[in-house]
Amino acid sequence: MAEDNSWKTPSFRQSVVNKINEAIQQSGMTSSKNGLEMENHVFQKARNKDEYLGYVARLILHVREMNTKNKNQQNPAGGSQDGGNPNQQGGMPDPINALQTLATQGTRPQMMGGQMGPGGPMGNQMGGGNASNLLNTLNRPQMPMTGGMANMQGRVGTMGGPNQMGGMMPGQMPQGMPGMPNQMGGAMGPGGMSGGKIVGQMNPMGQMNPMQMGVSGMPQGAGQQQPQQPQGQQGGPGGPNQMNPMGGMGMQVNPGGHMNQNAINQQMNQVGMSSGGNQMGNLGGNSPMNPGNMGIAPNQVIRQQMPPGMNPNQQQLGMAGGQMNQMNQGVGGPGGNLGPVQQQQQPGQVGMAGMGPGGPGNLQQQNNPQQQSQGGPNAAPGQMNQVGGPGGNMQAMGNQGNFVPIGANPMVRKQDMMSGGQVYPGGVVRSVTPNQFLRQSPSPSVPSPAGPGSIGPQSHPGQMIPSPALIPSPSPQVSSNIPAPRNIGQSPGQSLNTPGQAAAPSPLNPQEEHLYKEKYRSLQKYIEPLKRMIAKMEHDDVDKMGKMKRLLDILCNPTCRIPLETLYKCEAALTSQLGTIREPPLNNPLVEAVSANLQSPLGNHTLQRTFRPCLEALFGPDIKNLPTPAKQPRLAIDEPSTSGSTGSQEIPHILQGEIARLDQKFKVSLDPCAIGDTKTIKLICWLDDKHLPCVPPVAVTIPEEYPFTSPSCSLIEQEYNATPFLIQVQKSFLARICKLPEMFSLSHLLDTWEMSVRQACSPNPSLVAPSATSVLLGM
């Protein structure tokens, strides 16, 4: 299959830059690099789309983690323990350096953190895969940080109410809504349905997939089953002890630790809620609530303390009534003894301890999902520790509840809260801090629908999942036909002021966003004057020029988001330097471009080439230059010298102009025999053409109303009847005169006379019959 290069497009990269900038603004982190530089660094470092999306996800999580770390440092009593991550030292390291450190952790197992939902732990989801699913969520509007963020699986917020859990960080739990004591994460309201999913993953290749979250990458024997079963509890109208797959894959676990394939198919897509029942195989036993030991109000998250003998995998919540089932499954191999290992795990986190090489058929499974202790210290008797496996040599982890009564504070940070520990072949427990578990994995850890040997729900951190919006996406590489459910939900956005975020005003506030865009648009008019000023003061004040260049960078780079107050300061500085500039007219750029191009020598040539055809099509060809007048006047006006004449005969200017524009072969003069008292003008015209024979002249009478009345012409009959040639000229001329229109000019008349002479000179003069068109065109 061809490699997907859509992540290299400028639009995709710009959307990633915007998300990085939003994360930086929300965390309030000050860094020497902006989002554009960080994204460019990641882009140059990544070799393919999965690496690129994985780096970006961890970069954004690192930025958010910095905010949480600062809060924890300011509150030591509720702070988390530092497990020695070099990136967790004092101060605020640069995200790029943290990203470079992450790249060296190529073989470190990946842990998965679940989050506490309102009124109880959320349904954890566990699955392996690559980061190809990040594309679906990164391109989705209103979900800038959803889908496939590494190591942040299983976060679900409630729909509606003030209890939305948009961007909760580990160690922080919001106060649940009253009346929802028994509901797990993803609850839709009192009696709603949870989004917990039961996921089984088969790895028939005999080796654990290093992309799986929370699984240490230790090779196993051939034929091992490694089912990962994050168990999401759900309290609904029927009873508090129900395990509801909610459209996921319900998997029954029997005491032998084997998977029941039939149960998988039967419980798939179930939304059943059997009253008081348990849909998780042999997981039974209720933890009765001791009302006398209830020391806190309903839905208050208490501070969890860990004595040496207590399993740190417990989450203790004081609920308002009902019964909650505690579950702890500790499963070892045939010869393995996990025993009382204190696996330190983030509350709400599903930990899969990757134990050493075991025998074939070893079912390695350790699911400690969201233990809930109802009531006080006596709430532990109802715990059920399921032990299974071929060898049967297993000891369940001890679950001890310890309640600390709290009065007014409904939300207290957990203390001594450690994220998922990893059991290595030597039995050593490796613990990491809650801040480190976000950056455990150097590779993306979002399950792909077609991931090798893995079926897992793809959880979008930060999403509110309306139950049970699950769309099965079958995995072609898995032998069993178990669809991998995929969560489709709306993101509450990055703008929720949850406890894990700074309570700063959101940059996505529509009103502030509108003000920012309007102000930024109004400052665009200063760009050109600022450029001219920088060009003028190039060798003057270096410090001032540096400030001007920074201002220009802010105005020219819309992706560089700055606070609104800074934008007002920029406007004040520009106004003081450049004065108030009126908004330029819309056509100003066009005028400037035309004037700049006209400066070049090719400007006129370009205009001629561009516009001449259009002008000719509209207005016709240009008027040609008039023929040069003859050196000698063609019309010699003889002043009559008769004694009776009172003055010379006036010739109209229009006639003079026409005679002056006649061809030089026509010679025109006044008729000396004409009577001078009348307004009618009589002319004698000769044809003087070296290519035509000499013919007698014609007499033309120009009426007084010329040119509104056509002139008349008469041939001297005595002369034109002399020879057959002249007779032919006379016949042709008379025939052509009849074809002329009602109104014609002196020029038309003389041209017709010339064509009659030419027709008479032709070898077959009688074959040519003139028409009105030919005569009018002078043919």
Swiss-Prot record:
Give the start-end ranges of region Disordered: 70-131, 209-407, 437-512, 629-649
**What are the GO MF terms of this UniProt record?**
transcription coregulator activity
Is Membrane found in the keyword set? no
Which InterPro entries would you find in this protein's record? KIX_dom_sf, Med15_C, Med15_central, Med15_N
Per the record, GO CC terms? nucleus
Q: Where is the composition biased (Polar residues)?
A: 70-90, 98-108, 477-500, 640-649
Record keywords: Activator, Nucleus, Transcription, Transcription regulation
Q: Where is the composition biased (Gly residues)?
A: 114-130, 274-284, 351-361
Q: Cite a single GO BP annotation.
A: regulation of DNA-templated transcription
What compartments host this protein?
Nucleus
The reply to whether Transmembrane helix figures as a keyword in the UniProt entry is no
Q: Where is the composition biased (Low complexity)?
A: 209-232, 240-270, 285-295, 304-329, 339-350, 362-383, 393-402, 451-468
Give the PANTHER family listed for this entry: MEDIATOR OF RNA POLYMERASE II TRANSCRIPTION SUBUNIT 15
Q: How does it assemble?
A: Component of the Mediator complex.
| Role summary | Component of the Mediator complex, a coactivator involved in the regulated transcription of nearly all RNA polymerase II-dependent genes. Mediator functions as a bridge to convey information from gene-specific regulatory proteins to the basal RNA polymerase II transcription machinery. Mediator is recruited to promoters by direct interactions with regulatory proteins and serves as a scaffold for the assembly of a functional preinitiation complex with RNA polymerase II and the general transcription factors.
Q: Which family does it belong to?
A: Belongs to the Mediator complex subunit 15 family.
Task: Please identify the protein, giving its name as recorded.
Answer: Mediator of RNA polymerase II transcription subunit 15
The record lists the organism as Aedes aegypti
Taxonomy of the source species: Eukaryota, Metazoa, Ecdysozoa, Arthropoda, Hexapoda
Q: Which gene encodes it?
A: MED15
